């Protein structure tokens, strides 16, 4: 559980079932969770709401581009962005981190790894998480 509550977490994923489950997980610790389902809503929400953290599915955009991440970084340079994905290949992780992600969490381990990743990026810490490092990567 975080030391101080977040005012807002922005959750972006096209898959409604997953977002509902993640919202429940995040609300147990953080309170307000705003859900969006597309790139335009992510950019609008990030700019308008100024959330503390954004948890975003790597495949949010229909194409396999990380342009949304670069756009979020331009609009909200201090926003902590955690990318979630079904892909766990090192090349995918590296691409997300190089595009500006603060952390990367594999979806198959999201129930155990998301909250520790949020806490790590919130604290500005880098390096390995307390969970399996194969599942969570934090920007160094």
Residue ranges and their predicted role:
Residues 5-17, 22-23, 35:
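Conserved acidic segment of CheY-like receiver
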Residues 30-38, 45:
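Short hydrophobic/Thr-rich beta-strand motif most characteristic of the beta2 strand and flanking loop
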Residues 55-70:
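Conserved phosphotransfer microenvironments
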Residues 87-88:
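Short, conserved "switch-loop" micro-motifs in signal-transduction and mechanochemical regulators
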Residues 91, 109-119, 130-131:
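C-terminal output helix
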Residues 118, 125-140:
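CheY-like receiver
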């Amino acid at each position: 559980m975080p030391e101080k509550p977040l005012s807002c977490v922005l959750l972006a994923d096209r898959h409604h079932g997953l977002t509902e489950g993640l919202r429940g997980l995040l609300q147990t610790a953080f309170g307000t969770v705003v859900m969006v389902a597309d790139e335009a809503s992510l950019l609008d929400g990030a700019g308008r709401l100024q959330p503390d953290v954004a948890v975003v599915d790597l495949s949010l955009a229909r194409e396999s581009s990380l342009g949304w991440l670069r756009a979020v970084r331009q609009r909200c340079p201090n926003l902590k962005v955690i990318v979630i994905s079904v892909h766990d290949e090192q090349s995918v992780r590296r691409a997300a981190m190089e595009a500006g992600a603060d952390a990367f969490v594999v979806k198959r381990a999201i129930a155990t790894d998301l909250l520790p990743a949020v806490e790590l990026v919130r604290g500005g810490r880098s390096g390995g998480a307390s969970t399996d490092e194969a599942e969570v990567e934090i920007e160094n």
